[in-house]
């Protein structure tokens, strides 16, 4: 809070881009809306400047061909903190931030990047918290470990097309203090919280000692009003954490999603299971490549000889 901020942006991509500072109090020239400020064209450079006068949870994203560039991952979160570790002047103190950025991905838009996709046509296939989902949220770096008696500020923001519905177990003692970068008139205890696209909240938790559980994060399709998927954010007493001394990272396949073949650098063989758990491939790779042009659309799990695994999608 109170600092002067400069964001230096270089655009090496073949498309024009901007950085829209979503929710921050900036002047029009630095707001990143191309019709009222400027584009950063291919090979171009620009600097965005603003004063961080208000503490809170904010977002940023590209505002060029917004539907496509959002689902391609051009977004993030900005936190403005007070030096004294209080949420706002006269507000409660906390021990640390725990940012939770919700987003989703429509695979079709990444496979057809030159097509037009109006907002109402976007139907996400992948639903994420801080860019990961499913079992990945159980990795140590994505678990929120707490020390009893030390409040944690959950910084919640949605860049998803979905409506988020969060479920806070009562053992978290969750209280909402801020909405869209400003203190709420009266803080309130929260067990369920809806977050619409672009919204931000700051929720303080002070879990009970010894607690080990999850915050449920439901992703609802807004046009169809259907529950698409639920992710779970793990919260646990730090004394219950166990160092994972032998953890190794699985090789990353590319492109992912794919419609013809996927390549891994390193492993010579693997086994692949479909979403129903059926083994669909087991054997050596051809120079790291796996041919999938005749495979059915869906999600697959690749298991490597060292026991690590990763998921990939086939979309035709």
What would you call each of these model-derived segments?
Residues 1-80, 163-193, 213-229:
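Histidine- and aromatic-enriched segments that form or immediately flank copper-ligand environments
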Residues 2-4, 148-151, 254-263:
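Short coil/turn motif common to extracellular beta-sandwich-like domains
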Residues 44-48, 142, 191, 199-203, ...:
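Short strand-edge motifs at loop-to-beta-strand transitions and within beta-strands
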Residues 53-56, 207-211, 292-297:
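Surface-exposed, short loops/turns at beta-strand junctions within beta-sandwich domains
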Residues 70-107, 186-249:
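Extended terminal and domain-junction accessory segments
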Residues 94-148, 157:
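Acidic-aromatic/histidine active-site loop/patch
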Residues 240-265, 273-278, 297-299, 313-316:
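Surface-exposed, proline-anchored Ser/Thr-rich loop/turn motifs
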Residues 278-281, 285-308, 313-316:
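Short, surface-exposed loop/turn motifs with a glycine/proline- and acidic-biased composition
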């Amino acid at each position: 809070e109170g600092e002067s901020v400069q964001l230096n942006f270089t655009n090496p991509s073949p498309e024009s881009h901007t950085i829209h500072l979503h929710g921050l109090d900036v002047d029009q020239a630095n707001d990143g809306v191309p019709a009222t400020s400027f584009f950063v064209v291919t090979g171009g450079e620009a600097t965005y400047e603003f004063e961080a006068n208000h503490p809170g949870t904010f977002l940023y994203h590209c505002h060029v061909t917004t539907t496509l560039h959002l689902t391609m991952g051009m977004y993030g979160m900005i936190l403005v903190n007070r030096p004294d570790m209080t949420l706002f002047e006269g507000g409660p103190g906390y021990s640390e931030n725990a940012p939770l950025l919700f987003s989703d991905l429509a695979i079709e838009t990444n496979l057809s990047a030159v097509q037009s996709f109006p907002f109402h046509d976007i139907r996400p296939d992948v639903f994420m918290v801080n860019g990961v989902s499913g079992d990945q949220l159980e990795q140590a770096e994505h678990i929120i470990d707490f020390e009893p008696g030390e409040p944690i500020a959950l910084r919640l923001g949605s860049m998803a097309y979905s409506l988020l519905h969060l479920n806070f177990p009562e053992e978290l003692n969750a209280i909402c203090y801020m909405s869209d970068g400003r203190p709420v008139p009266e803080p309130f205890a929260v067990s369920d919280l809806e977050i619409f696209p672009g919204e931000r909240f700051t929720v303080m938790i002070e879990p009970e000692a010894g607690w080990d559980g999850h915050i449920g994060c439901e992703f609802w399709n807004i046009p169809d009003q259907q529950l698409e998927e639920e992710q779970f954010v793990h919260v646990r007493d730090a004394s219950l954490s166990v160092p994972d001394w032998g953890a190794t990272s699985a090789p990353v396949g590319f492109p992912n999603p794919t419609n013809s073949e996927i390549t891994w650098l390193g492993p010579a063989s693997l086994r692949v299971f479909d979403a129903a758990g059926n083994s669909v491939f087991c054997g050596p790779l051809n120079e790291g490549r796996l041919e999938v042009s005749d495979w059915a659309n869906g999600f697959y799990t690749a298991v490597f000889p060292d026991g690590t695994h990763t998921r990939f999608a086939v979309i035709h």
